[in-house]
Structures are given as C-alpha cells and as structure tokens.
Amino acid sequence: MKRLILLTCLLAFVSVTEAWAKRPGRSFRRSFVQVSARDPRYFCLSDGQPYIPVGCNIAAMGSVADMEHYLGKMHRNGANFGRVWLNTNLFEIETRYGEVDTAKLVRIDRLLELADRYGIKIKFCIESFRHIRPGVNKWDTKASYHTSNGGPFADADDYITSQRGEEEFLRRVRIFRERYGDHPAVFGWELWNEMNAVETPEEHLRAWNVRMLPRVKEIFPKNLVMQSLGSLDRESSFPIYEFINRLPPNEVAQVHRYIDEGAELAVCGAPVDSMASDAIAVLRGYGLRKPMLLAESGAVKPVHTGPHPIYKVDTMGSVLHDVLFAPFFSGAAGPGHLWHWDHHIDKQHTWFQMGRFARAVEGVDPLREGFEPVRRDTAGLRVYVLRGEHTLLAWCRDTVSTWRHELSERIPAQRLSGLQVDFTPLLGGRRVKKVRIYDPWRDEWVRASRRADVSLPDFTRSVVVRIEY
C-alpha cells in the first residue's frame, strides 16, 4: 500500500511538474502581437520573437467551466491562439440598450486570466449581428437596439449609416479599451463577424469600414485591428473581399471558407487542402504585404445548414489536419482555424492535431527565412513548399485519401511506400546540411540522407520534409 501511495504521489508530482514546464514564459505573456517590420507577411511579439497563431475558433462558449475546459485543452496540445465572440450570451455586456452588465465584464476578465495562464492570445470579435428588428436578442439579431424595444434604430442599415450608430459602436469599443486595451493576452480586435451578411447595401458596408477601421486602431494602438467577411464560396463575394482586405487600416487579411457541397464555387467541394490553399491564393493574388489567415474553415452541410456529417466518422481529425497545414504551407501567417471546436474537435478528441502542426514548425523562424510558397507536386502527392533563406519546408499530401474517399465513402487511407520528391530545382545550388522528415500521424521525426532528392518513408495521408542548407 505504501508503495502504491508513493507511486501515486510521484505520478502526481511529475504531472504537476510537466504542466508547470509547459507554462508560457514571462516574455511571451507580457508581449503584444504585432505585424513584423522585418517581414510584414508574418506576426511577431513585441519582444521580437516570431509568433505563429496555432489554435481554433472558440466563439460561443456556454459557461465559465467551458472557458477552462477549452483553453486548457488548447494549451495542453500546443495551441497559442483562440477566437472569441463578444456578443454571445456568456459575454454580451449590453442585453438592454444603454445598460452595461458588469457581470459580463467580470467573465471576460476571467477569460483573459485563463488566456494569460495558458499562453493563449485571444482575438476578440466585437460584433456579429446581422439584423436590428423587433423581438429578442440572438446571435444575429440586436433586438434591444430596435425602436420597439426602446432603442434608437429602425434597422441595421440605420445603425450602419447614421452618426448615432457610429457613436454607439465606438462607445462599445471604448468600454473594452478601458478594461483590456493594455492586456497582452489580446491578439487583436475584429470589428465584425462576416460583416457582408449585415442587412445593409454593400456600398454602406464599404464606407463604414473606411471610416471605422482607422478609428478603432486609434483606440487600440497596442493591438491588431482587422475585419472578417462571410465564406468565400461565390463569385459575387470577390469584389468585397478585395476591397476590405486591401484597406491599409485592416492589418490582417482574413478569409473564411468551408467544404460546402451547396456552394457556387466548385473549389468548395474539392479536397480540404485544395479548398484551403486556394483561399490563401486569392488573398495572395491581391499583392498584399500583410499577414493572411484562413480565419474560419471546416465542413458544413449544403449552404451552411449545419456541421457536415463527415465529422461523425473523422476520428483522426483529417479535416482539422488539412485546415491547419494547407494555409501555412501556402503562404499564410499561420495555420487555418477550424470553426467546429465543439461539433468536431472536442467531440472527436482531435485537439492533438494542433500539437502536431506545432511540432512540424517548431524552431522555424518565418521572419528570418523570408519564405516564398511554391508547389512541387509529383505523382500521387500535392506538395506545398515554403522556400526560405536557410530552410525548405514541404508538406506532402496524398491525392487519393480525400474527405470524399476516406470519410464519405469510408475507404481507409492507404499506407504509401516508395515515393520520392526532388527539391533540387528549388535549392538554387545550395548545399544540403540536414534533412529531416516528420510524420504528423505518428508524431515521429526521422533523419534522411543529405540530398535534395528526398526518398520519403512509408506514411499515411501526409508527411512534412524539412531541408536545412
């Protein structure tokens, strides 16, 4: 019995020690996220260190216990980023027009305490309503602002176009500034979730963003300021995407896109990696020198009528895996951020995929490398390459084991053997110093021969190659 007690105490000590060892360093916790002056396509911390935002959306948590659960899971699996909506039941500070609920501010305080403890930088989304109409408040309806409920606005367009509407939005922003504007656990402030879904003409939306983005930046000089738009799944969305993402005060170019078999664009039914990579390619096509993120992604039923049924069988998190890897290896400032934190990640216990991405890029400094994304596809593989000054990173994705093949048709992913990828043309004659290969499905690194013509070990679905020169 004494031995059992001693062993139990020892295991508890080891567990606590490991948890403490994983606590973020003081410099990370005290640093703000910035756009890097050295390479403005990537983020850095105010202490000069590179920052790659690894995480997901945790937009609508139901309780304080959920906050502890999700942030703890993220921390233990290598994440350092999360996106939270401030107009949900848990955090909405104004359920009645003109009255601030201080209890909700205390909850936000608690969220940031947890974020600080776990090393998670939080992107706060300030608004997400699409309508102002009679009734009760919902995530997409701000009924308390309607004239029938004592508010000053006839509809959402009235709010967007009027001086009173701007004043009300900035009043809300200043409440958050007073309390959180100097908090380093804040990644940044997103003005609106998918603002092109608001019930207002597009020209009014454009004018509002031109006015408000710089004003919000003045209020939050220490934090990033950005905007988001609805899923890029139809031709009509391209003009507003280009307009909003080109605005200089919009510091982070963001795109939302999902696997959606009801979407107008065929790419939304393509393999997940192709869908995600193409979304970043659209942003890169604007010639921007700012960080780019696939800020919402995943798989949905046709026309966003619910989570896609493939999540129920995706026990290995292959959708999450592709959403994480494809954007970064296509030139984004970080991995993609899945939307379905509750319907997929937590239900299927696939948090570990974030840690696998973090391990794949561990020690990589995008600011030093000046990465340029290129493709080096070969038979049976889509090969996404980041070519840097000192390092070449490549994510090699099996072309056969797609979501349709493995998850819809239930055909297991096959183990691939004898594949090679020749990176010689990408190295410009530089001498190879080291080659390592990472299998994210086994969480294993292996050394390979010091040559640019790389023979891949047997693997399933995907593998990462790192060449140092």
For each feature predicted by the language model, list its residue ranges:
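C-terminal segment of classical bacterial N-terminal signal peptides
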Residues: F13-A19
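Extracellular glycoside hydrolase catalytic/binding regions
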Residues: R171, E178, M195-Q353, A358-V361, ...
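Aromatic- and carboxylate-lined catalytic core of secreted/periplasmic carbohydrate-active enzymes
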Residues: K22-R23, Q49, R289-L293, A299-P302, ...
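Active-site mouth of glycoside hydrolases
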Residues: G25-E264, G269
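Positively charged n-region of N-terminal signal peptides that target proteins for export
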Residues: M1-L4, Y180
